[in-house]
Amino acid sequence: MKRNFDSVKRLVIKIGTSSLVLPSGKINLEKIDQLAFVISSLHNKGIEVVLVSSGAMGFGLNVLDLETRPAEVGKQQAVSSVGQVAMMSLYSQVFSHYQTKVSQLLLTRDVVEYPESLANAINAFESLFELGVVPIVNENDAVSVDEMDHATKFGDNDRLSAIVAKVVGADLLIMLSDIDGLFDKNPNVYEDATLRSYVPEITEEILASAGAAGSKFGTGGMMSKIKSAQMVFENQSQMILMNGENPRDILRVLEGAKIGTLFKQED
């Protein structure tokens, strides 16, 4: 299937913790700089971009020099609150190198479930777009207890990114991960696993091919990405799942390169 994203004017990019934090726990500064360059390039072309960024926990562990994620919810919240400040400080600094202004929006599930607060959120996004600002979104981990327990809030930022895409009426959601896309079976187990370039619907076979593992710093796994794709389908939009190793590949994707997996319903 030929890919054409010429009509994309509003884009949501989601980046996971594993793309921002190295296995050693150090921050991947090169990756963040590349991401800022790409988003700034798109911004300069007139494309409105929202960045949904995980990483508060990973940044917090780095700042506090902790090797493992705390077990207690209160400490998880504390570490995330420290990390969120560090992450946004770095984003602001790096984006400024490309003369791009950014803002922080921390959401909780109740914000998008109640009409009044949802309207306020939409107004905030639209105002930021009008001001030429790139919104950087994360869940408010310090008060969203269920995010810490992987339960019933947004659950993880995969789902949050799909919700944000709906809220802002995005033409495309690009989900950056530590995998190349959706395979027909687990590529870490089966050497003959094949990358699916195009997924027009979420079938039982697709669900069965999704695993459940996330990284040690994050909460998301393949199943959460598939569920996000389902939400995108419900919103009559489209999603790309691709490896975040080289953020500059986003530019190639938007030019039509067949990178990652495209989730798009048949016309």
UniProtKB/Swiss-Prot annotation:
Entry-linked CDD domains: AAK_G5K_ProB
Keyword line: Amino-acid biosynthesis, ATP-binding, Cytoplasm, Kinase, Nucleotide-binding, Proline biosynthesis, Transferase
Location (main, coarse): cytoplasm
Binding positions for ATP per the UniProt entry: K14, S177, D178, T219, G220, G221, M222, M223, S224, K225
InterPro entries reported for this sequence: AceGlu_kinase-like_sf, Asp/Glu/Uridylate_kinase, G5K_ProB, Glu/AcGlu_kinase, Glu_5kinase, Glu_5kinase/COase_Synthase, Glutamate_5-kinase_CS
Any GO BP annotation: L-proline biosynthetic process
Keyword Transferase appears in the UniProt entry: yes
Catalysed reactions, as listed in the record: L-glutamate + ATP = L-glutamyl 5-phosphate + ADP
The protein's Enzyme Commission number: 2.7.2.11
Protein localization: Cytoplasm
Class of this enzyme: transferase
Residues annotated to bind substrate: S54, D141, N157
Database matches in HAMAP family: ProB
Family according to the record: Belongs to the glutamate 5-kinase family.
Role summary: Catalyzes the transfer of a phosphate group to glutamate to form L-glutamate 5-phosphate.
The protein's name: Glutamate 5-kinase
Gene: proB
